[in-house]
């Protein structure tokens, strides 16, 4: 049995993705900042027959993130799928002319350093398995910079570049790296933006592989 690790797990997309992979027999590692939060999600999944455990870690704390992933592997088995989808903090989303150099540290730590820590941890295991998927979930500012959310735009651009390079480098090894762009956020009355529909799209990216970037709502997606 292998594991899907969801970093930034919440009651919307994270829980829906966990359910979708759980139906395929994956164990689920739920990682977020608050232990009680992920324990509640794990309990919900457990009642539905999904093997799930919660682990507390702030993605801006490299040691804590590595420890959470390490414990998940011990508890649940090797990680085959990594989803990186923490929600940006409100303070990351200031207008560009109000954003200082210091303001960029947090977004970059979350969206560039955090993914690098997680990928570098899981990559040896994926290479040993000879397969696997790394999934980056981002908003529209990862594609088109938005001056109203400068920190996130800068950091998501770095995350996108890192993901694209990983996609190109790891494809020959049978490891797929993909990015799902969700414009306008999750929900909002749009059927293809609902958590369950997005979770299905995420599972399809893992199953079918292909190109790096998919944008929800695009006809070619």
Name every feature range the model reports, one short phrase each.
Residues 67-74, 94-98, 102-110:
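Active-site Tyr-X3-Lys motif and surrounding loop/helix of classical short-chain dehydrogenase/reductase
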Residues 25-39:
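Conserved glycine-rich Rossmann-like NAD(P)H-binding loop of the short-chain dehydrogenase/reductase
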Residues 88, 101-102, 107-108, 114, ...:
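Catalytic loop of short-chain dehydrogenase/reductase
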């Amino acid at each position: 049995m292998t594991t899907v690790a969801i970093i930034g797990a919440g009651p919307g997309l994270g829980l829906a993705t966990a359910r979708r992979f759980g139906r395929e027999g994956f164990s689920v590692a739920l990682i977020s900042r608050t232990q009680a939060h992920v324990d509640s999600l794990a309990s919900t999944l457990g009642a539905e027959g999904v093997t799930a455990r919660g682990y507390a870690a702030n993605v801006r704390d490299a040691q804590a993130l590595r420890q959470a992933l390490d414990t998940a592997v011990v508890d649940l088995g090797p990680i085959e799928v990594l989803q990186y989808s923490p929600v940006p903090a409100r303070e990351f989303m200031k207008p560009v002319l109000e954003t200082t150099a210091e303001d960029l540290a947090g977004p970059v730590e979350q969206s560039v350093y955090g993914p690098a820590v997680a990928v570098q941890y899981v990559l040896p295991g994926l290479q040993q398995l000879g397969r696997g998927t790394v999934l980056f979930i981002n908003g529209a500012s990862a594609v088109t910079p938005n001056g109203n959310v400068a920190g996130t735009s800068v950091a998501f651009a770095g995350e996108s570049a890192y993901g694209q390079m990983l996609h190109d480098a790891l494809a020959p090894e049978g490891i797929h790296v993909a990015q799902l762009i969700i414009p306008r956020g999750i929900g909002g009355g749009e059927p293809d933006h609902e958590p369950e529909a997005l979770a299905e799209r995420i599972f399809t990216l893992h199953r079918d592989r292909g190109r790096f970037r998919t944008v929800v709502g695009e006809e070619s997606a």
